[in-house]
Amino acid sequence: MSDHKIKNKESLLSHGDAGAKAQVLELTERVLQRLDARKRLHEMMHREGSELVIGRRRHDLSRYRHVYAFSSGKAGNHMARAFEDLLGEYLTLGVTIIKLRDEEDVYRKTEVYVGGHPLPNEEGIRGCQRMIDIAEQMGPDKMVLSLTWAAAVPN
């Protein structure tokens, strides 16, 4: 499993000014690594026992019978994996709507829907409906965490 964001580096360097391209690709790789949604979420939140710490706020996950995690957008897969990492056994179910399925992504408790962009498709609509169905059943013993990558929000 490669942790590199640029998957076709060799192909890009195989023609033209390889030295200049290598510098640009190295810088681009570093920027993409820094912007990785999974890594960023781990920087912004962590768990201490049963408490999920987000910034200065603490949420005792043991108070909830069910904890759900929703994510959507191009980084939906990375956000879903971060939710699974962070919530662990407290996660009841995750639902994510992504643009592309990545073979490196392995989920334990997350339903994955591949949505259309810029126009919605049937699978994306099913993912939205799944989130709505869960949200309609919410009560004081349930928690939902939801993150949307910018491109998933209509302008």
Report each predicted region and the residues it spans.
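Non-transmembrane, aqueous-exposed alpha-helical and coiled segments at domain scale
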Residues: 2-155
